[in-house]
From Swiss-Prot:
It comes from Dinoroseobacter shibae (strain DSM 16493 / NCIMB 14021 / DFL 12). GO terms for cellular component: cytosol. It comes from the Bacteria. Homohexamer; trimer of homodimers. Its EC number is 2.4.2.1. This is Purine nucleoside phosphorylase DeoD-type. Phosphate binds at G20, R24, R43, R87, I88, G89, S90. The gene is deoD.
């Protein structure tokens, strides 16, 4: 048990999927895992452990934003021995060739700042995904016929951004999408020698202003969860 996670020793699997929304964690566990058991509900941040194709898996919420994810990922790694951490979540597309419902596999993550920025001083650390997970996820997506894009994303530390100039530069430099967690996850994985990947479903588009209706968001996210699970155990 830690300050923020009430799971007992052994309750957390070495492979952890991390959606931002705790209710999405519950949905994913009940939909894709066999015999899921709730192992955490401290502060309403739900976590479940079960099995997928005979492999133990934990699906645990991270909350919104890098500071929240940093708390849970740190504790999952240092106190519970998590070895593989895969963020599953939504993203806003930033390129015309990326459409709603597409999946983005984040190879690298740009950011202005993360909770870890202070330890690097003048160094601009470049967080990246684990190559083995990335390669396996692309193969799994291809086998499913899911339209997938591999490349850089932007992890923002604000949701209501008031800097259109920054968005313009991200688009100009080919950034595929924006979200709020992956850069810190990749940084923590690098620090602790763990594997990390972000598998993201496009729910909104910054250029067209299209968005998935809320009723469809859950059903459209199934491919993302399956890709993450298949990549974790490839």
């Amino acid at each position: 048990m830690t300050i923020h996670i009430g799971a007992a020793p052994g309750d957390i699997a070495e492979t952890v999927l991390m959606p931002g929304d705790p209710l999405r964690a519950k949905w994913a566990a009940e939909t894709f895992l066999d015999d899921p058991v709730c192992v955490n509900e401290v502060r309403g941040m739900l976590g479940f452990t079960g099995t997928w194709c005979g492999h133990r898996v934990t699906i645990h919420g991270s909350g919104m934003g890098m500071p929240s994810l940093s708390i849970y990922a740190n504790e999952l790694i240092t106190e519970y021995g998590a070895q593989t951490l895969i963020r599953i979540g939504s993203t806003g597309a930033m390129q015309n060739h990326v459409a709603l419902r597409d999946v983005i596999l984040a190879m690298t993550c740009s950011s202005i700042s993360t909770p870890s920025s202070g330890i690097f001083c003048e160094l601009n650390f470049a967080p990246c995904a684990d190559w083995g997970l990335l390669k396996a996820a692309e193969a799994a997506a291809g086998a499913k016929g899911t339209k997938t894009h591999v490349g850089g994303i932007y992890s923002s530390d604000v949701f209501y951004d008031e800097r259109p100039d920054l968005t313009e530069q991200m688009i100009r430099h080919g950034v595929l999408g924006v979200e709020m967690e992956a850069a810190e996850l990749y940084t923590l994985a690098a620090r602790h020698g763990r594997r990390a990947l972000a598998v993201l479903t496009v729910s909104d588009h910054l250029l067209t202003h299209d968005a998935l209706p809320s009723a469809e968001r859950q059903s459209s996210f199934g491919d993302m969860v399956e890709i993450a699970l298949e990549a974790a155990f490839a």
